[in-house]
Swiss-Prot record:
Compartments it resides in: Periplasm
Name of this chain's protein: Cell division protein FtsP
Keywords: Cell cycle, Cell division, Periplasm, Signal
Any single Gene Ontology cellular-component annotation: cell division site
Location (main, coarse): periplasm
GO biological process: FtsZ-dependent cytokinesis
Organism superkingdom: Bacteria
Processing and modification events after translation: Predicted to be exported by the Tat system. The position of the signal peptide cleavage has not been experimentally proven.
SUPFAM superfamilies assigned: Cupredoxins
A UniProt-annotated Pfam family: Cu-oxidase_3
Amino acid sequence: MRSLTRRDFLKSGILASSLSCIPQSVMAASRLPLFIPPLLEAKRGRPIFLTMQAAQTSFIEKKLTEVWGFNGHHLGPTVRVEQGDFVKLNYRNNLTQAVAMNIQGLQAHSELIGGIGRVLKAGEGWAPILPITQPASTCFYHACTLANSAYQTYRGLVGMWIINDKDTHQSKLPKKYGVDDIPLILQDVLLNSKGEQVFQNQPHFLGERLLVNGVEAPYLNVPKGLVRLRLLNASLSRSYDLTFDDERAFFLIAREQGYLPQTKIVKKVSLAPSERVELLVDLSEGGNVTLITGSKRNLLNKIGTIFSSDMLVDNVIVELRTEGVKSVFYNPSHWQFHTDAPSLLAKKNMKTREFYFDVSNATINQQRFEPNRIDISTKRGQIERWILSSSRPVGFKIQGARFVMKSINDQPVEQSDIAWKDSLWIDGKVEILVQFNHASSTKFPFIFGSSDLVLADQGCLGSIVVQ
């Protein structure tokens, strides 16, 4: 937290006087609607075109500013595919700098996912055909250019990638995209007086404003009934604690790579960089409710954000406003889902590896990333036990593989919370069981390491070859 100056005191007094005159209802009424990214589906062999290019948007006070994104929009469209599809993907780089792309969570051969070895220079394209073999999951695509992934993702090179399967279609889960199945991409940003993104070259990046699908503190009109929220933490360094402002319980149904064994009733869910969760909230009784990060704020809390260098100006993620008549309500309290994730806990005699993340020096086991060095060699079908620890809390992710969390600080993870994952938050020590189902090569290795992209760009990464 920065030191307090006389100017800060004067500033806080003016703000307090101003805010005290504004009713909460008026502040809520000034919200902008949530932007729903366009939906691209690979139906009947239709190619998916993703063109990286500059675009224009307005973050504050209708001030247009240049951003990056895909197909003419800030951020990317939501790509939705089906298990069993062969997806024709067509990237095109219309930016002025080279970009490498990754589909985080996609389970496929390394030469098809993209990654740091697949760099598209300005004006270049790439068109892989992706076999979709994994069950239902929420993945995302983003820039992973070596030493430049944080800046490029921050500017807008990120989008959601949804995989559906037969079980999804047969379930009673909400599945109308943008209506009761809502994508929410979280990014914190710094903006200057012109409304332009500011990127500071610091060890970690913590912005002052929280954007959701590119909009600050938005609202969304939703039908009465169950609403499904798919949340992606696309922030560079910041983690979030998701809760509702009225402290209501909601249902956690899935993490990055698939469903939990059954719905879990919770009041708070944490989200590290690169993590995704799927939530269900019961809005069958109507009314409005707001999803926030952290605690509900009063006037003094809002004034206090002036003095903090790492607090968000507004901690609202989205306000859900119900409309229409009450729909048929299915109580999801005891819904069960098909998943083989818990079976991994019974495996024995696995190779054990330990990784220590020195956050201050951006190293893993005292080494920074070296493109010509292979850090891990393993085989397809192998299951390994990894023990992760860090000098300070930090996000972790792995490409091309999946894992289950076995223990956190030597305490077993509850059976009800076991799901396939590819990202997590290290706060102390975490034990995971990693499954390698797909091959990679020395030219296109899988990458693991910090999901804090600022740290990753400094070298907090490692490479994996799976034969």
